[in-house]
């Protein structure tokens, strides 16, 4: 049957009844047909006759009533009698429906009966509401406007009547039946749920504001149904979860919990009001997850150790649903990163030599693999969670700065990182393809960000860069520039300013050399020559204490360049770094083969070999006297020559003895024409490392003192504790200072009269 729109001015002619009883008797047949025999249908003519009868009754009565004389008495004339007769009919009709519902003792049958009658009743109520539309528009509206008596529109009247005569009598059994059906559903028992949605919708529809139907009001639904439903849910899952955990693994339980939560969401979508979703899930999550958090958390470490990725992802998803579920996971993850990282680093420490002989490449690759695996876990399993990222940062900073390699010295990580960077940026690197250099540099910066003693890295990196530039062994200018840019991005311009100046010196040196080659004195001895003029303020290089005597073959070139430079730069002084200089010597020493070899040597080595143009044999004492080399340097050089069989040690002689003899090997043979003899001497490397660490300590003291002076100059007076804290805050981007070192620097500044102690724990700045 279709709802019709009527026009009050175009109604059919219908017999007018002189009395209320006559009108109601006619209307009642139609009302009862709509409520009780709706499936039989009703003709449009019949429907319009009923509508017209209501209109005529109200219209005739309203002829003597105006807005000015409308009151409770006149309202009765206008339409209240019809309204009251409808109320009585609904009471009688709904009493019969109530008996039908109560007579059903089976859970599903009662729900089916209730759902059937409710659906039929609400459909009929909509037609009745339209049928009494004139009464709604005039009498109900005026009644509510001009009297204190609340009158419902016809549809609301039907709902209120249902609530009073049906629902309020069977609500308890209806609730229990609904809860029973939901429990069966959760137990996966065969359940016909088609009536459940209708019954719940009935409860929702009956939860209205009787004073204003336009206002949303779910108070009855919430207090009567939702509260009991959620409590029933909690009881169900409390029992099930405890029993399931007792007989299944944590992995199985997590899967079960996810399935159950998804099922509860589906229950709401299919059968309940959408507002129930949030409190239902919160209650279910509390029972399934929060109340078992400790047991679940205890298994998380195992999942991480065994790399159970699916379990880890599922654990994170579930724990993220509870208020404090993720905090223990973050702590466990942090400990896992440290524990696994420490164990991985320990495996690469050589049994002989210990942490002192750790290979930089192997060490850095181990740290990187640990970081990348952990970062991948954060991105995939923890969805890039910022708190888990912080836990990773905390753990990895601990790993980088306090692993077994760093036990003796916290500066080992930055030192090894600088050496690894050097291996990537040097031409001799054979392990990294040129296309992968940029990726390697980015990986270095990843580790660098976690290094606490960035000043240590700076010192070692600067020294190694100096070697690459001096020896011409940089892999590429682009790679060097890229590395500087990355360091500047992390630490700022000041950190890389000296490094930038070193590259400028190399460019200027090329210009100086090219200009020198235009002069006649540059061709002295017909020797190819180039010089690097390096500023002492920027380069970590200094003359050694060796009184080296330059070979006579090189003296004219040496003097010619020095005179040229002084003529261009008056007032400057050149300090020659012969220990860093190198060259090539053509040698034809085997008369049988007559092969010309090219020896790549240091200037010190050159000073020794060129002597053999004059004699075939020298004693150790003679070599030392002629070259001016110290015992350590000369012994190291001769050892290299003896191993390469360029020189031969006299019979029964011992290396380093004053009278031991060293003869040129006229039978020297080598497959390669170019022979690299300029090899690092281990004692030099060890001494260099010690000197670097010494320089770092001295630089730190100066840095601390300058920071303290800056702070005190700005603050004038400070307590000891505050000064220490502010000093640490200023310096921590470069390294983590010890409190004892800060105190020592304060004492030094007091001695220098920059500061004065006032009382026991306060300092005054002295201008």
Swiss-Prot record:
GO biological process, one term: SCF-dependent proteasomal ubiquitin-dependent protein catabolic process
Covalent crosslink: Glycyl lysine isopeptide (Lys-Gly) (interchain with G-Cter in NEDD8): 713
Post-translational modification as stated in the protein's UniProt record: Neddylated; enhancing the ubiquitin-ligase activity.
Keyword match Signal: no
Cell location: Cytoplasm
Keyword terms: Cell cycle, Cell division, Cytoplasm, Isopeptide bond, Ubl conjugation
GO CC term (a single one): SCF ubiquitin ligase complex
Cullin neddylation domain span: 699-760
Molecular-function annotations in GO: inositol hexakisphosphate binding; protein-macromolecule adaptor activity; ubiquitin protein ligase binding
Pathway, per record: Protein modification; protein ubiquitination
InterPro entries in the cross-refs: Cullin, Cullin_CS, Cullin_homology, Cullin_homology_sf, Cullin_N, Cullin_neddylation_domain, Cullin_repeat-like_dom_sf, WH-like_DNA-bd_sf
Domain of life: Eukaryota
Task of the protein: Core component of multiple cullin-RING-based SCF (SKP1-CUL1-F-box protein) E3 ubiquitin-protein ligase complexes, which mediate the ubiquitination of target proteins. The functional specificity of the SCF complex depends on the F-box protein as substrate recognition component. SCF(pop1-pop2) is required for the maintenance of ploidy and directs ubiquitination of cig2.
Stated family: Belongs to the cullin family.
Subunit and interaction comment: Component of multiple Cul1-RING E3 ubiquitin-protein ligase complexes commonly known as SCF (SKP1-CUL1-F-box) complexes, consisting of cul1, skp1, pip1 and a variable F-box domain-containing protein as substrate-specific subunit. Binds to the pop1 homodimer, the pop2 homodimer and the pop1/pop2 heterodimer forming the SCF(pop1-pop2) complex. Interacts with pof3, pof14 and skp1.
Protein name: Cullin-1
Organism for this UniProt entry: Schizosaccharomyces pombe (strain 972 / ATCC 24843)
Lineage: Eukaryota, Fungi, Dikarya, Ascomycota, Taphrinomycotina
Gene: cul1
